[in-house]
Amino acid sequence: MASVTLRGITHRYYEGSGSVTAVEDIDLGIEDGEFVVLVGPSGCGKSTTLEILSGLSQPTEGNVFFGDKDVTNQPARKRDIAMVFQNYALYPHMTVEENMTFPLKQRGDVTGREAARAVEDAASMMGIDEKLDRLPGDLSGGQRQRVALGRAIVRDPEVFLMDEPLSNLDAKLRREMRVELQELHAALETTTIYVTHNQEEAMTMADKIVILRQGEIQQVGPPQRVYENPANRFVADFMGEPSMNFFRGRIIDGDPPSFDFEGQRTDPIPLSNGSVRPDQEVTFSIRPEHIDPVNSEDGDIVGEAALIEPMGSHFEAHVTLDSGDNVIAMLDPDTRLREGDRLGLRFDRARVHLFDTATGARVD
């Protein structure tokens, strides 16, 4: 096992007559045994970062360290890593056992008996020990992914690199495999760097998440801390389903200062934040689960229930405000509310977030 460090990593490639920056000035430290998830929308640079870590791509600038060793110019075959891909990358003409044994044969420093024992142990760990004589085409998607993971395990690498390994699975199987991956990491304690666009995977699996946008790191930290304290509007909007509600307005001077909603006929909301400036244009944000339905006269904002979506444990109320803006509130299933009803919405003041309207930076 090893710690992993990226220092000043930038990667550019040429397209047409110009260059495109895929990632820029990435600084990231990953501790030995940590499970880190790189998450972000398509094209944000997460897969490029993984390719640089693997040695499949070379950075234009910067260095990659495994422990204290600079591996920037070391090819993939000489790095002590194991990769797992979303398309499994199994040899269709080889049995499960042959697929899992293949990386050990390539290394050439393992005896046949040692290889057989490693495959047996990994297959047992992944629950595929009765499938060793099967071909990949005879297996389900979940079983093929377990073979791919087992093949990575037999290498006993310093670092696991995983690129969207669950994206081809259905929702139920994805959830099951997510749990298995967490159990696997707890058992092996191998440094793992995992790429996904799925925020649920990031929230549930990671010790630390790294949120990327347009090739730059937006925020790094434990999942719950990032969720509760987003560094900017992009992170606030990206993390969470449904996403945050956003309202434009301005700060009114006072003790305490208050927020005046743009286009709303409601009273300004007092704020506990002392760092905002009078007349500063800010975006007021709150998550759907931190909104309560109240009588119209008691609401921070007022509107009409346009759509109610039952979700089992709760329902999501889509409310059209008098200003024309739309808000999503996550409400208790026992709440008595029908489409077309007028209602007020009250915010949990301790859960309010403020972002500078011009820059998107957090100001609270």
Give residue ranges: language-model regions.
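ABC ATPase nucleotide-binding domains
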Residues: A76-F234
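Helix-to-loop junction immediately C-terminal to a conserved catalytic motif
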Residues: S54
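Conserved ABC transporter NBD signature motif
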Residues: G62-D70
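Conserved coupling/switch loops of ABC nucleotide-binding domains, chiefly the family-specific signature
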Residues: T60-N63, Q214, R248, V352
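ABC ATPase nucleotide-binding domain
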Residues: T5, G29, F65, R250, ...
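The feature captures the beta-strand-to-loop junction immediately N-terminal to the Walker
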Residues: V39-P41
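Non-catalytic connector elements of ABC transporters
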Residues: P242-M244, D253-D364
